Amino acid sequence: MSWQEAEVRELKVGRYILIDDVPCKIVEITMSKPGKHGEAKGRIVAIGVFDNQKRSVVYPVKHKVKIPIIEKKNAQVLSVMNNEAQLMDSETFETFVLPLDPEIADKVKPGMEVPYWEAMGVRKIMLQN
């Protein structure tokens, strides 16, 4: 699996983090002050890149978290059938099938180039709505 490590205090809104081994985009991060008996804590709220689920975690600011390496690639659509698209990677010419989200199913047509993201062994078509 491809990831890096970073401390919680280094994170910013808009960056990515692994929560429960799922790549998520940080939408909110708050740091508390150190208390009498403990160090400062960071509360991170993030939304899953591939499943759009909201997740939140609390860690000490010196805690090391995993940062996913997200590869952004392009592929050509070979065919569309039953809410699935067969794609061919533009660089490696590898063919694979990905499910289509209902919002973008009518926009994806055979022959067009589409961007897709790959992280932690999962791929998703990332068309702009």
UniProtKB/Swiss-Prot annotation:
GO terms for biological process: positive regulation of translational elongation; positive regulation of translational termination. The modification Hypusine is found at K36. Transmembrane segments: none annotated. Keywords: Cytoplasm, Hypusine, Initiation factor, Protein biosynthesis. The keyword Cytoplasm applies. GO terms for cellular component: cytoplasm. InterPro entries: IF5A-like, IF5A-like_N, NA-bd_OB-fold, Rib_uL2_dom2, Trans_elong_IF5A_hypusine_site, Transl_elong_IF5A_arc, Transl_elong_IF5A_C, Translation_prot_SH3-like_sf. Functions by promoting the formation of the first peptide bond. PANTHER family: TRANSLATION INITIATION FACTOR 5A FAMILY MEMBER (PTHR11673). Belongs to the eIF-5A family. This is Translation initiation factor 5A.
